[in-house]
Amino acid sequence: CPYGMKLYAMQWAMEQGHQSILWLDSSAWCVKYPKVHQDAMARDGYYLVGNGDWKADQWTNDACLAHFGLTREEAAAIPLVSGGIIGLDFRNEIAREFFRQYAEAMNAGAFKGSWTALPEEGSGERYRGHRHDQSCASIIAHRMGLFRHPEQTYDYYYQPTMPDTVEIALAGL
């Protein structure tokens, strides 16, 4: 699964001695120094932002749900986090445990699946496809009791005029 590259990149950065890592997908860029992100990572051990009102039951295939021992009904209570912005401060046990579970899910094949709703991968009227690492990160964050940092405050879908609080802008490529 290509989304495993995020974990390999984070692992490599840790091996190079970096302790605080802010992953940004290629569609995200800093519009100013990410101080709020860095401060949150230092304070909380992580930075996770929500992904609208989407829930894990909508974007997680049956195999991934089975890996985590969840039903689709249980997953309906789990909000999605964005896979495009993930910050971890590995000096914090919370970040290390999140990463451990994230890597375990990747190694178990839970990232694998189709972006579109294939009947052989998912069931239920609400199922729309699989979001790979994002689905796993959402379930892990929920189980660990991690909160989502504010949406559309420090991270914003690009517009010509954005709030002064925005540090990272997102736009499709």
Predicted regions and their residues:
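Glycosyltransferase catalytic domains, chiefly GT-A lineage
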Residues: 1-173
